[in-house]
Each structure stands twice: as C-alpha cells, then as structure tokens.
Amino acid sequence: FAIQSLVEAVQDSAQSPHQYTRPAGHPNLVTQLARRYSAHLRKEIDPFNEVAVTVGASQALYLSLQTLIKPGDEVVLFEPFFDLYVNQVKLAGGTPVFVPLTFVPYDESDENVVTGGEWILERSSLMEAVTTKTKAIILNSPHNPTGKIFTRDEMEFVAESLELADPECVVLSDEVYKYIVHSPPKERAPEESLFCRGHVHFASLPGMWERTLTISSAGKTFSATGWQVGWIVGPSHLVTRIHQLLPYVQFCASTVIQEALARSLPRADEPYQGHDSYYDYLREEYTRKRDLLADALRQSGFAVPDYDRTPGGGFFIFARIGKDIAESLPASRQFAPNVAAPGGIARQDWAMCQWMAEEHGFLCIPSSPFFSLERAQEGASDEFVRIAFCKTDETIMAAADALQRIARQASSPLAEDAELVS
C-alpha cells in the first residue's frame, strides 16, 4: 500500500505534489503525524508548531543538535551507540560523554562456553556522567546495534538524571524502530499505544514532554529507507527553532514522498494480510526472520540473546563470537594493520568480519565502530558482531549455509592451515 500511495500521489495533479511544499513539512503529512502522536503521547499535538519534517531521521538528529549544542557543551551517549551520533555531536561543537551499557551474560559457570546475555543501564554510571555541562542525552530504543529495549525503570533513570544537567538539557529520543518491537511473551509485553506494542515513548513520561525531541522516520517502518523522510515531534519552543534552520539546509523534503506517506499512515492502521494492522504484520514478520537467523547463529557457535528472557527490537542481532569460531580465526589476521579499523588495528571483531566476508561470503558489521575508540582499544567490542535480518528468507537461508561452512572450519584442527594455503 505504500507503493500504491506513492503511485497515487505521483498521478494526483490536483494536489500538485511535484512542487515545493512548506519547508517545515507538507501540511497533509504533519497533520497525520500530529494525529498519530497525539494518540501515542495522550496529548494534543499542534501539527504546525510541534512537528518538523526532515530528509530522513539522520538529518532530524543533525538539526536538533545544531539548535541545541554550542562549543563546550556535553552530550551523553549510551555505549554501544549508533556510530553516526558521535560525529554529529562533534559537528555541532559538542563533546560526547559515553555511558557504557553493562553486558550481563546469562551464565558464566563454564569458562569454555560463551553465552548470550542482556545489556543494562546502571543508574550509577548515568548519574556520574551527567553534569551541569550536559545539554543533551541521546536515547535510542529499540537500540541499534544491540536490539535492546530500554525498560521503563531505565527511562526513569534518564528522566531523573536531568535534575543534574543544564536546566535546558534535552533528551533526543531516537525511535525509528518503535514499530519493530519483536513479539514478546505475553507476560513480558509492556503497555500498548496505537499499535506501538512493547514501546514506551520517552516523551510520555511525567514531565518529559517539555524536555524531549522525539525523532523517527518512514524508512524503517515501511521498509523504504530510500524515501528519506524523517520527522521531529516536540514542544514548540524547541521545534520552531528547527523550523527556522530548515530553509537554510534544504527548501523541503520531497513533496511527493511526503504526500505518499501522508496517505500511507492511515492505511497502515487497517487490517493487513491477516493481521489487525500493518504494524502487527511488520512485528511478526521481523520476529520470524530474527528467529531464523538466531537459530542459524546458535547452530554455528555464536551466542545470541534468549528472546524469551530479553525482549528485543529493530532488525539486528548483536551476536557474541563463540570460542570455537574465535579460535578458527587465523592468527595472522588478528591485530593486523588496517586503515579502516578503529585505531588502524584489526582487533578480533574487525578481523572476524573481514575473514568471514572474504573467505565465506558472509557479511556482517564489526562492533568496534559502535564503541568509543578508547573502549574499543581496551577490547570492549572484541566479542561482538552485528548481523541484519531485514532480508528475504532466501538471503537468510544462504547466510545460514555460510555460517555452517564457517562452523565446519572452526571444528577442523586444520582451520588455520587451510587459510594459509588458500
């Protein structure tokens, strides 16, 4: 239906969607977004003063930081983090301050067995990082790269920390994956809000509307990242500052894409392919694909979260490299010079990803770019790789075959010799 909406918008000469539209957002789209967020946040949203439309969520974050941050200001990032955040903070003149999430394995009773686990935010770590220099905190839930869903308690820690920050400190809540909270067990399912099952909007917490800019986009929700339409929702005193900056960055996001999205949003609420809504279909489809990839990873010696214990979201698995897989990595590849790797050295995660791509045709992302350089060089990222499952079933099954080849090589005592001969 999103493609059909685009076709209709392209052909609708009466709406004239092929010309410039309002720089702060096409009227039809901001009206639809305001309607939706009014229901999400249980408050009336003004479409023309509390919504801004941007060229993707990345630009939404960039413009938010540009209006909030000046040289010397600090911005708190939860580590690991989406790698784009750090340089956007620096481009605004700010200083990133990293708060490590703590990885807690499910079981460490056998030192020879690597298990999955969960990432948690410790209140003390956050409180130590926030000072009167803190002008923004970037919160991303569901989280890229780990798939973590921040709990309500953890979000309340963030809200509490604002008491220690600059009085004008703002939380930038990156919620691009909010409709992709995987189907949790019923007893673990959090509150629901207009098809956002399992998702808590940070701005809905008591007193947080005035301190929050909520960022999202069409790309992840409608599997249309090339559409490049994002948005910001927040109080007028913050959003109108972004309105003032928008005409100097681009005149407007694509009018015809905005019109297509405005038509798609109400259609997404309707029954879709046997589900109550498109959003329910999306959630179940990604949960199914996640499980396909997770099973293949487990069978190949990687450790992944137990999703009955640890609800997840987004479309990545942050897998832990098993001991057999790690030992199969040729020693010549580890700590080898690599200009692309953080610090110019390929630690285990980087070397593993390069080896799997070059030798086995299996492509995933090393975890070190999601960590500060200091922590990556200390080895915090060595054990993890990020794998996407926003793929066709055929691609996931081909990945499973590649993982089996990797596992067979890992179980062979001649693994390193085979690499050297090749």
Regions found by a protein language model. Name each.
Residues 1-56, 63, 264, 271-274, ...:
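N-terminal small-domain helix-loop-helix segment of the aminotransferase-like
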Residues 101-196:
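Active-site phosphate-binding strand-loop segment of PLP-dependent enzymes
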Residues 6, 204-287, 291-302, 405-407:
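Conserved core segment of the aminotransferase class I/II
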Residues 127, 346, 354-364, 368-422:
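PLP-dependent enzyme catalytic core of the Aspartate aminotransferase-like
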